[in-house]
C-alpha cells in the first residue's frame, strides 16, 4: 500500500533506521531461546483452543468439518467476574496459518513477535523522522544531527519501555502486534498524504478493505479512524492556516470515510452475533459508574504505570487502586481529572492554532483514543488492566512527545538543547535498564511466577502464584527435593487462602454495603472475593487430596448468588455436584447458570443431566449440538458427543465424531475407531479419510 523505501532516500536516514533496527534486535535477542511459560501460552502448545495443523490440506479439513465460527470464553475468575465470548472467522483462519508455520516451537513465536516489534519500531522511527520535522520552528531550527539523535532516542525509548516487555515476550500476543503494525501503516499513509484534500477512489477501496483485516483480527483497532482524524485535523491547522475550520473538518472526514465504513460494517457484524457477551450490564447506574468512576481510576493506574514502571506483573489487574466508596478523595480526584482531560481535549480541538492547545491535542488526543478500548468505557472486559494494553497508546504518546521536543528544542539556545537531550537520554537509559530486568523475569515459568508473587497485592494473588509455582515443581520436576518444595509451596498456598477467607469475612462485615455497584459488578467486593478464594482453595485441595467431598464443602457456602460467580467457578462446582451424585442441586445450579453464562461445561453437564436423570436423549443431544455450534473445536464437547452416540448406538454419528475428535487431537485410537465403524457402515470415503489421517500422524510421530 505504501512504498516505504521511497522515503528512505539518503544514507544518513538509512543509518538512523539501521541503528534502531539493530539496537532493538540486540536488546531482545537473548529472549529468543526462552521456553514456553506455564501461562496462557498453553493455548498454543496444549492446543486447547485450536489444533495445530500439519499441512495446508489439514487446515481445509478443519474448516470443512468444524467451520470458522469458533468461540472461546475470555475470562479469569481471579481478575473479575466479567466474561466475554470471543471469536471471529478471520481469527480462526489466521491462527491456523500461524500455527502451521510455527508448530509448537517457542523460538518461532518469539522470533515472529520480535520481528513485528522491530517493524513497529522502524515505522515509528520513519514517522518521527519524516513527519515530526514539520513541527520544527524555522526561526530557531535545530541541527539535522540533533533531530536524528532525538528520533533515535525517542524510538528506542518506546521500543525499550518496560511495559512493552509483556507484549513482545507473551507468545500468544502476536495477533495484537500484527494489528498495531497494520494500524501504524494506515497512520503513516495518512500522515504522508495529509496535504492531499482528496483520495482517489481506488485507494479508498483499498483502505476500506485493508482496515477490515485488523478489525476482524482484533477489536483493539476500533478507534483508529478517530485517531487518524486527530492527526489530520491537527496537521491541517499547522500547514494550511488560510483554510477555515469547517473546510478542515469536512476534508478530514472525507479522507477517513473508507475507515468509517469498515468500522460500521464491523460494528453491525459484532452486534449481530448471538451471545457476544455472557455478562451484561442491565443497570444504568452501573454503566454510569463504570464510565465516570471506574474508568478514571483505571486510566490513572495506566498513567502511573507509564511514568513509574516499577511494579510490573502479569497480574497488573490486582494492582489497580479503587476507592472503597463513591466519594472517597482518590476516586473524586481521578474522576475530575478524567472529565477535565476530556474537556481540555474538546477545547484544544477548537483552538489548534495556539501552540499550547495544539501540543495538548497532539500528545493526549491519539494516546487517549488508543487507550479507550482498555479503559472499560466502551464495554466491560474481564481484564481490568494489563501492561500489554499500553503498547500502541505508548507509541502514539511517543509521537506526540517528540513533536513537543522538536518545538521545544527549536525555541531554546544550544546549551539548553544539549541539556534537554541529555535528560531525555538518561530517562531512556533508566527505563531500558528496568525493561531488561523485566525481560529476565520472563526467562521461564518459575521466574515469571516468582516475580508475580513478589508483586502480589493480596493473599488471593499470593496464593494463586504459590499454587502455580508449587504445581510446576510438583508435577514437572524430576528430583525429590523439587517435588518436596512444590508440596511445601502448595501447603503454604492453602494456609494463605484460609487466612484470606477470615480477612475477607472481616472486610465484608466492615464495608461490603459501602461499595459501589460497579465494584460488585466486577466481583471486586469482599463477598465475591471470598468465592474466588474458596474456588482456589477447593481447586488446590482436590489437586492434592483428590477429595471431591471436601472441595464441595469448601465451595458450597459461596455459591448462592450465581450472577456474581465466574464461569470457571461454576464449572468446578457443577463437576463436584456430579461427582457426589447431587443431581437435583446440579440441576438447580444449571438452570440458573445457563441464563447468565454459556460455556461448554454448562452445556455438556446439562446434557448429562437430561440423559442420566430424565432419560431424555433428545434434549441431551440438543445441548451437545448447541455446544458444538458455539464451540466446535472444544475437546470436552467432542468427547461427550462421541460418548453419547456410542451409548445410544448411533454408529454413524459415533464414527463421525470419533473422526472429528481424532483429527482435532491427533488421536490415532479415535481415528481407528472411526475407520472400523465406517468400514462396517460401508462408507468407503470416510474410512479412507480416517486411514489417511492415521498414516499422517504415524509419520509425524
Where are the language model's segments positioned?
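C-terminal luminal/periplasmic domains and tails of membrane-associated envelope-modifying transferases
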Residues: 3, 7, 450-701
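Polytopic membrane enzymes that build or remodel cell-surface glycoconjugates and lipids
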Residues: 2-480, 484-508, 526-539, 543
